[in-house]
Amino acid sequence: MPIKIPDTLPAFETLVHEGVRLMTETEAIRQDIRPLQIGLLNLMPNKIKTEIQMARLIGATPLQVELTLVRVNGHRPKNTPEEHLLAFYETFEEVEARKFDGFIITGAPIETLEYEEVTYWKELQRIFDWTTTNVHSTLNVCWGGMAAVYHFHGVPKYPLKEKAFGVYRHQNLQPSSVYLNGFSDDFAVPVSRWTEVRRADIDRVPDLEILMESKEVGVCLVHEKKGNRLYMFNHVEYDSTSLSEEYFRDVDAGVPIKLPHDYFPHNDSALPPQNRWRSHAHLFFGNWINEIYQTTPYELAKIGTGER
């Protein structure tokens, strides 16, 4: 089944070109099934790029999904036109009364700040708390994952001596997990962060289970059964060129940065990188969407009540 997004959203044309099945409002109405309601709280500066990355993966699943784009009020992004936000985004207040089958909270390039220093931290805390009653399953990504596991469990983040940056091998620690169905034992994941959460802190929380980990860059994916939450600290959703764009951006700005680990062929930044994580990114999002479909109440109003 396709994903339903506004026909005029910039991501629409890109995704059609890539072969992702999309659906218009009229086509959605003709299908006599309830589409899964997925919200995306987009905290990234370049919102359009993130919309494409997330919609590409969600839209590849065999279920009808309706995607709602959400933004915080406490911050105005510099890299996304105001007209785009007004046309395609809802504020949290505008969706607060709604229920969602799934909700994604993205990262943001503010990880070196203390959480309490973030201008929209109190609003984000409200959103985290709201997901416990209004969302069936929440996927918190990168900084969003670190912020969420700190908010709910007090798990701290630690600064790294140098940026974890590149494509790193990760291990499948729980092959029987529904979220890792079809995963290899060892696979590649893009990483781009200045901070980390540590296994020792996560192991102290009985409700948390580590699903993916790298020997080089640590914990990647954590599942919380009680709250039906996932904490993904890396970037399976990244495009083939995302890391190179970050690298050349820093080079052009004069920011000291090493070549991304195991990314450019022969460590030559003049050569186009090869995507070695795409299949597992699709697997992960497909597994997440499928688990939501299998377990969410048919009636949206029952989400958060414990009823099916």
Swiss-Prot record:
<keyword id="KW-0012">Acyltransferase</keyword>
<dbReference type="InterPro" id="IPR033752">
    <property type="entry name" value="MetA_family"/>
</dbReference>
<feature type="site" description="Important for acyl-CoA specificity">
    <location>
        <position position="111"/>
    </location>
</feature>
<feature type="site" description="Important for substrate specificity">
    <location>
        <position position="192"/>
    </location>
</feature>
<keyword id="KW-0028">Amino-acid biosynthesis</keyword>
<keyword id="KW-0963">Cytoplasm</keyword>
<protein>
    <recommendedName>
        <fullName>Homoserine O-acetyltransferase</fullName>
        <ecNumber>2.3.1.31</ecNumber>
    </recommendedName>
</protein>
<comment type="similarity">
    <text>Belongs to the MetA family.</text>
</comment>
<dbReference type="GO" id="GO:0005737">
    <property type="term" value="C:cytoplasm"/>
</dbReference>
<comment type="pathway">
    <text>Amino-acid biosynthesis; L-methionine biosynthesis via de novo pathway; O-acetyl-L-homoserine from L-homoserine: step 1/1.</text>
</comment>
<dbReference type="GO" id="GO:0008899">
    <property type="term" value="F:homoserine O-succinyltransferase activity"/>
</dbReference>
<dbReference type="InterPro" id="IPR005697">
    <property type="entry name" value="HST_MetA"/>
</dbReference>
<feature type="active site" description="Proton acceptor">
    <location>
        <position position="235"/>
    </location>
</feature>
<feature type="binding site">
    <location>
        <position position="163"/>
    </location>
    <ligand>
        <name>substrate</name>
    </ligand>
</feature>
<keyword id="KW-0808">Transferase</keyword>
<keyword id="KW-0486">Methionine biosynthesis</keyword>
<dbReference type="GO" id="GO:0019281">
    <property type="term" value="P:L-methionine biosynthetic process from homoserine via O-succinyl-L-homoserine and cystathionine"/>
</dbReference>
<dbReference type="GO" id="GO:0004414">
    <property type="term" value="F:homoserine O-acetyltransferase activity"/>
</dbReference>
<feature type="active site">
    <location>
        <position position="237"/>
    </location>
</feature>
<dbReference type="Pfam" id="PF04204">
    <property type="entry name" value="HTS"/>
</dbReference>
<dbReference type="InterPro" id="IPR029062">
    <property type="entry name" value="Class_I_gatase-like"/>
</dbReference>
<feature type="binding site">
    <location>
        <position position="192"/>
    </location>
    <ligand>
        <name>substrate</name>
    </ligand>
</feature>
<comment type="function">
    <text>Transfers an acetyl group from acetyl-CoA to L-homoserine, forming acetyl-L-homoserine.</text>
</comment>
<feature type="active site" description="Acyl-thioester intermediate">
    <location>
        <position position="142"/>
    </location>
</feature>
<feature type="binding site">
    <location>
        <position position="249"/>
    </location>
    <ligand>
        <name>substrate</name>
    </ligand>
</feature>
